[in-house]
Amino acid sequence: MSLPHIDLLYSLSGLFVGILVGLTGVGGGSLMTPILVLLFGVHPATAVGTDLLYAAATKATGTLVHGLKGSIDWRITGRLAAGSVPAAALTLWWLHTHGMNTPGTARMIQLVLGIALLLTSLALIFRPQLTAFAARNPLVPSPARTLWSTVLTGAVLGVLVSMTSVGAGAIGVTVLLLLYPALATTRIVGSDIAHAVPLTLVAGMGHWLLGSVDWSMLLSLLLGSLPGIVLGSLLSARAPERLLRNLLAATLVAVGVRLVLA
């Protein structure tokens, strides 16, 4: 069996994205998938499928760290997964029935990806204001309403992530901050990262079964991104986080508009 080919350009892209993820905490999907589609000309379905398994590997590392710190609320993680995993399976079935590699499906994935990037940029820009608003005016819904709102949030994320690999990070955290204003932000982030592991793994394996995963590309990306995340995390204490987030949000707006109008 031949060894997979390592592409240096993919590894350098992974390093760049990994550093940004470590610096800002923004999920790699919102960065890596557009790079693969727009810069490398990768088919949208292959870019999404490969990035999902890439995300599963990186999120698993983050889950281990948060688990050791005790900053995961497994109740929230379970509620999200109860909605997202079935929604991911249904979305993959829908993509399969419509033809994963047809021009129409490629255009639809690209359009939804652009919309997801625009939503992610809004979540990044307005998260501080939403967090402050939630702290001043905490919602006090019934336990049942909170439960089903969380499951519904998971279902929406399941559809978005399965189609675009984007949404589990910035969008998920922002909604959880509104649903659980009394919970520490670190526990919300940890719970969201832990939820992303089964979601991206199920969605990624589904894409693999449908033939839209490039394993050589995946390995090349991971070889660059894993050390990049470590480096970015080490530099994060010295980096101007607010400036980086605003620049990143502006970039996502530009890329999102480009994908929607393409």
Enumerate the language-model features and the residues they cover.
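Juxtamembrane transmembrane-helix boundary motif
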Residues: 1-13, 38, 65-163, 206-209, ...
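Alpha-helical transmembrane segments of multipass membrane proteins
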Residues: 18-19, 35, 39, 63-64, ...
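Juxtamembrane transmembrane-helix termini in multi-pass membrane transport proteins
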Residues: 24-77
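Transmembrane helix boundary and interhelical junction motifs in multipass membrane proteins
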Residues: 25-32, 165-173
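Interfacial segments of multi-pass membrane proteins
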Residues: 32-45, 171-187
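Transmembrane alpha-helix boundary and packing residues in multipass membrane permease domains
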Residues: 34, 51, 92-93, 174, ...
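Conserved glycine-rich helix-kink/hinge and helix-boundary motifs of the Major Facilitator Superfamily
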Residues: 49, 189-190, 249
